[in-house]
Curated annotation (Swiss-Prot):
GO terms for cellular component: cytoplasm; INTAC complex; integrator complex; nucleus; SOSS complex. Pfam families: HEAT_Ints3_C, Ints3_N. It comes from the Eukaryota. The modification N-acetylmethionine is found at residue 1. The modification Phosphoserine is found at residues 502, 537, 995. One of its GO terms (biological process) is mitotic G2/M transition checkpoint. It is found in: Nucleus; Cytoplasm. Belongs to the Integrator subunit 3 family. This is Integrator complex subunit 3. InterPro entries: HEAT_Ints3_C, INTS3, INTS3_N. Residues 1008-1022 have a biased composition (Acidic residues). Component of the integrator complex, a multiprotein complex that terminates RNA polymerase II (Pol II) transcription in the promoter-proximal region of genes.
């Protein structure tokens, strides 16, 4: 297999030095268009990205050809210093050489490392773009070199390489055992295995890698080569699951689903035994399988098992294809991805993706677009394997089993009920099978948790009725098309839903929660899975595409989307004649330049002194209708350069913004244009984030971001914060790429509005992917973005505790990129409960282990309530014992003595006055006792240190009998220390008789001997006699006093 040879060459090159090649030259031998990046034919148009990369490569080649290495380096560095565009050209040129010229790869990588001024950010972004958009057309040689380059980036520890690895993993298709796919799976696995220490630094990468390879293990069986790969995958997953289980816990309930599929593999059998019978062996914070099953899986994980091409085409079907015209699309998808026996396992991935990721808006739901339930019905009916069919049904109902209305979304459970409802007439067998599965899964999923599963399914059905997805379930459960046994079982399991005689009615709702609705579909149910005329383009990509990664890059062959003609007739009669003529010219304008000229004339007329301001509302209505296409289209160019940004703001609408930027704020014309924008904003809220984009992208608007504040105050909202949040929310829903592009400038220009709460942060982390997270982290570290400040970071992180797991990890990653002392947020510990907040506890624990224990840190750690299942405090104390034992001993001594000195009444008053836990003496002693037990079988001598023993003596001398009894083993350490210590001179004893501890030490020799004797005698006894022993010591001390 040629690609395997390439892999070997790449690996050899990675280990080589000097001018050794990058390997993989043999892989592309004889490929069409040799030396080029992408496969193409003579009929294909030249790819824009390829042209640009080849241009950059020719610049580098012209500068380095025929000169010495030193001269070449000098020339490259001199060129890079000229500015950012030149820096980008050289980086991309060297990057292209690495991909196309294996023999020069090692040298080019060294040059790239030397000239890069942005931590390889340009190269990382370009790799992500190629993987997401061009990988299927990439030449074999370039694929091999891309793997080689990623391996080098990982070896060099380049920040952001983890994001590239995750994008690479996304390209590994499930259910595909072709040579190229197996090569890719093995190549990425080799990188992750070789660079294991690097992998362990990224929690998200650990979880994503485990999720990916657990899923792939199922596909790899049969041949010796696949078995060998499978064993490597098993070893990799098992090692990460056992060593970093808390990081894997962020996957949520789908981790259990994947582990069930591999449960018969011996290594996973042993892991299952620990998960069920000994969860603490995996992590002190893991309480059992229920903890996993009650955690919803983030859409990031569900999406990672579909390749970009699959995802794009599936999204196209659910947003562009009309119901009744889907057959050719489905046939194409079937031929491309589901035609082999091995590919049947992909159906689960597709169903989980549709349920958990594809959540259409109410606008799409109420249209005639192909609904989700129809695609799932097709996937179920076309399944050719019994095992795959069972797994597909489990995937469909998986979120039902432990559904909680507070944590889970109605959109995750809605497809299953609608598949059953709509299949009853055309495919009753499908409905019967699914209802039977729903009943039988309750006792059979996991018998010890049968009660939880029953409650989950009941909550799902109840929520479906409450949200009016179906008004009643009785017509579905009591339908005469079902056999008697099944109907009896449904009545037995769900009597609450079998009482209403009303016919099934699906209701349109206006709630924010999106629902499926019946409306247009009733007459098409007969053929809901396999109808009509339409087709995918067989081209993997549309060469003229512009836009974000997940935009649709292919179109129907027989149907094209026809824009409905804009009708502004109702408004024209209300306009002055001259303005009406100009608006009509704007409507008829064929090119952007002509429209811009007319738009400028309209603005000029608005600014004339005799303009009737009452016409602003009508004019705004006309403009909103005329620019509908502009608001639907892409805003941010695919290639972000100064030229492309300037070109993107050359649209007619943006002329209003440009005129606004050229005016003084105290000018009456300025107010008039703001009023026009305010009217437009009422009719088209997207105008807000378009203004933000213009102020960010246009050179004419440089330094004018404060205009947005004037705009916000001119709107009906009248408030900057509310307006900004609404506009960013609209941007988040329309274009995540644009949201990420705007984020640095929004945080920089409006710090008071963005940094005081977590509202904007939550919007961002809810939609970004791993590559975009890495990009934001880079912005923070380069000083371009500040998302947290000391005075509000604690409150924001506390707010984040209610977010989804992946969102919380993103928030913590962004926080850790800032240079904010950990002590600033350490009080969050008092808000964290070990069952409810594992994400925050894991991140905080991993950060605390890098810090030296300050008194405040130790105080907060010790103030956590003691619980046998909460190992947080013991874990970090143990780590500090190993690394900073003397410092920790001093901190604990200080806290013990302080808390022991506080009057008891004052302590209880203080603790009752606050809802948050206060540090008490008993808490400290409980945590120390747990630590003592944890260190019992180690060589660590933490409790033999003088400060700890002195502090324990101090506490023992003044605490009550109940505490002495409870912590007798702990206090016995101090007694042994006292017995072994040298007695102080007589003169010092006399001077110190006023303190209880001194009086205790002043015990007369006969009593001391008696104490020693009783101590040695009690070594073979139980700990119960010890309080009695202390009483004897206490009485002797009193005797000393009386003397």
């Amino acid at each position: 297999m040629e690609l395997q040879k390439g892999k070997g060459a790449a690996a050899a090159a990675a280990a080589a030095s000097g001018a050794a090649g990058g390997g993989g030259g043999g892989a592309g031998a004889g490929a069409p268009g040799g030396g080029r990046l992408l496969l193409s034919t003579s009929l294909d148009a030249k790819d824009e990205l390829e042209e640009r990369l080849e241009r950059c490569m020719s610049i580098v080649t012209s500068m380095t050809a025929g000169v010495s290495e030193r001269e070449a380096n000098d020339a490259l560095n001199a060129y890079v210093c000229k500015g950012l565009p030149q820096h980008e050209e050289i980086c991309l040129g060297l990057f292209t050489l690495i991909l196309t010229e294996p023999a020069q790869a090692q040298k080019c990588y060294r040059d790239l490392a030397l000239v890069s001024r942005d931590g390889m950010n340009i190269v990382l972004n370009k790799i992500n773009q190629i993987l997401m958009e061009k990988y299927l057309k990439l030449q074999d040689t370039c694929r091999t070199q891309l793997v080689w380059l990623v391996r080098e980036l990982v070896k060099s520890g380049v920040l952001g390489a983890d994001g590239v690895c995750m994008t690479f993993m996304k390209q590994i298709a499930g259910g595909d055992v072709t040579a190229k796919n197996i090569w890719l799976a093995e190549s990425v696995l080799d990188i992750l295995t070789e660079q294991r220490e690097w992998v362990l630094k990224s929690s998200i990468l650990i979880a994503m890698a485990v999720y990916t390879y657990l899923r792939l293990i199922v596909d790899h069986h049969g041949t010796a080569q696949l078995q060998a790969l499978r064993q490597k995958e098993v070893d990799f997953c098992i090692s990460l699951l056992r060593e970093r289980f808390m990081e894997c816990l962020m996957i949520g309930r789908d981790l259990v689903r994947l582990l069930q599929n591999v449960a018969r593999i011996p290594e996973f059998e042993l892991l299952w035994k620990d998960i069920i019978h000994n969860p603490q062996a995996l992590s002190p914070q893991f309480t059992g399988i229920l903890q996993l099953l009650q955690s919803r899986t983030s859409r990031k994980f569900l999406a990672c098992r579909l390749t970009p091409d699959m995802e794009t085409k599936l999204l196209f079907m659910t947003s562009r294809v009309r119901f009744g015209q889907q057959k050719r699309y489905q046939d194409w998808f079937q031929r491309q991805y589901l035609s082999t026996p091995d590919s049947q396992s992909l159906r689960c991935d597709l169903i989980r993706y549709i349920c958990g990721v594809v959540h259409p808006s109410n606008e799409v739901l109420s249209s005639d677009i192909l609904p989700r339930w129809a695609i799932i019905g097709w996937l179920l009916t076309a399944c050719t394997s019994n095992v795959a069919a069972s797994n597909a049904k489990l995937a469909l109902f998986y979120d039902w089993l432990f559904f909680s209305p507070d944590k889970d979304s109605i959109m995750n459970i809605e497809p299953a009920i609608l598949v059953m409802h709509h299949s009853m007439k055309p495919h009753p067998a499908i409905t019967a099978t699914l209802l039977d599965f729903m009943c039988r899964i309750i006792p059979n999923f996991y018998p010890p948790l049968e009660g939880h599963v029953r409650q989950g399914v009941f909550s799902s059905l109840n929520h479906i009725v409450e949200k009016r997805v179906l008004a009643h379930l009785a017509p579905l459960f009591d339908n005469p098309k079902l056999d008697k046994e099944l109907r009896a079982m449904l009545r037995e399991k769900f009597p609450e839903f079998c009482s209403s005689p009303s016919p099934p009615v699906e209701v349109k709702i206006e709630e924010p929660v999106s629902m499926e609705m019946d409306n247009h579909m009733s007459d098409k149910d007969e053929s809901c899975y396999d109808n009509a005329e339409a087709a995918f383009s067989d081209d993997e990509e549309d060469l003229n595409s512009k836009g974000k990664k997940r935009e649709f890059r292919f179109h129907p062959i027989k149907e094209t989307v026809v824009e409905e003609p804009v009708d502004i007739t109702p408004y024209l009669d209300q306009l002055d004649e001259s303005l009406r003529d100009k608006v009509l010219q704007l409507q008829k304008g064929s090119d952007t330049e002509a429209q811009c000229e007319v738009m400028q004339e309209i603005v000029d007329q608005v600014l004339e002194e005799d303009f009737d301001s009452e016409q602003l509302s009508v004019l705004a209505s006309c403009l909103q209708e005329l620019f509908k296409a502009h608001f639907r289209g892409e805003v941010l160019p695919e290639e972000i350069t100064e030229e492309s940004l300037e070109e993107s703001v050359g649209k007619p609408l943006y002329l209003i913004f440009r005129n606004l930027c050229q005016m003084q704020e105290d000018n009456s014309s300025f107010s008039l244009l703001l009023d026009l924008l305010s009217e437009l904003y009422q009719k088209q809220p997207k105008i807000g984030y378009h203004l933000l984009y213009y102020l960010r992208a246009s050179k004419a608007a440089a330094g004018k971001m404060n205009l947005y504040e004037s705009f916000a105050q001119a709107t009906q909202l009248g408030d900057l914060h509310t307006c900004l949040m609404m506009d960013m929310k609209a941007c988040q829903e329309d274009d995540v790429r644009l949201l990420c592009h705007l984020t640095p400038s929004i945080y920089t220009e409006f710090p008071d509005e963005t940094l005081r709460s977590g509202e904007l942060l939550n919007m961002i982390v809810a939609v970004i992917d791993s590559a975009q997270l890495q990009e934001l982290v880079c912005h923070v570290m380069m000083g371009n973005l500040v998302m947290f400040r000391k005075d509000s970071v604690l409150n924001i992180l506390i707010q984040s505790l209610d977010w989804e797991t992946f969102e919380q990890y993103c928030a913590w990653q962004l926080f850790l990129a800032h240079n904010i002392p950990l002590e600033t947020i350490i009080p969050i510990l008092q808000h964290l409960k070990y069952k409810e907040h594992p994400e925050a506890l894991s991140c905080l624990l991993l950060q605390l282990r890098r810090e030296k224990p300050s008194e405040e840190m130790v105080k907060m750690v010790l103030s956590r309530p003691c619980h046998p299942d909460d190992q947080f405090t013991t874990s970090i104390l143990r780590h500090w014992c190993m690394k900073h034992d003397e410092l920790l001993a001093e901190r604990i001594k200080s806290l013990l003595i302080k808390n022991n000195s506080l009057p008891r009444k004052r302590q209880s008053l203080r603790s009752s006055s606050s809802k948050l836990a206060q540090l008490t003496l008993e808490q400290i002693l409980e945590h120390l006792d747990n630590l003592r037990l944890n260190l019992t079988n180690t060589k660590q001598n933490f409790f033999s240190q003088t400060p700890i023993l002195q502090a324990l003596q101090h506490v023992q001398a003044s605490c009550d009998e109940a505490h002495k009894m409870k912590f007798s083993d702990l206090f016995s350490l101090a007694e042994e220390y006292e017995d072994s210590s040298t007695k102080p001179p007589k003169s010092r004893r006399k001077a110190a008789l006023s303190s209880p501890r001194s009086r205790k030490n002043a015990t007369q020799p006969p009593n001391a001997e008696e104490e020693s004797g009783s101590s040695s005698a009690s070594e073979e006894e139980d700990t119960k006699p010890k309080p009695t022993k202390r009483k004897r010591r206490g009485s002797s001390a009193v005797g000393s006093d009386s003397d």
